Amino acid sequence: MIEQSPESLSDIEILDILQSMKKDELDVEANEIIRNGGKAGRQEAHKQALVALNTSFEEKFVEAVTLALGLNAGQAKKIRYKKDRIRILKVRGIDYLAIDGAETAQVLSQVAQAISREDAIVTEGLHNIFPFWKEGWPMVQFDNAYKILSEDIAIHYQATLDDLISLYGGN
């Protein structure tokens, strides 16, 4: 995370950090998991990569929003939850649901949660998210899900950074 507290940074320093965050790659750890998975463990590797991708996105998203909006520790913790994310950003003039890929962030979070807590069973919220996922059945085709979600979450992260940068007059 940032070495200095957001309160001690000038607007120009915050803008510079946010612009440098546009170079962040969300899928580094996930791609490493996939590479190490080999052919035999392809689906298992992609399953674990989805969890790693979600973790990476959430960490970087929270870091960027906390920095840009000067959130306190309690707000930074709450920004991880969709309703609070919408509310906190709305107060600062950002319509989170209008940001490209906002639903992808929710889907990725639900997928990671289902993998971690539901033994990779498709939950009600994920039913038909992909044509091959049906509620109550085990998730399948993790490689296809990963490909779609990794591309979409990168777009969402960039769009979120663009909105945060615009708060500081950047483009």
Q: Where are each of the predicted segments found?
A:
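Glycine-centered loop/turn motifs
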Residues: 135-139, 143
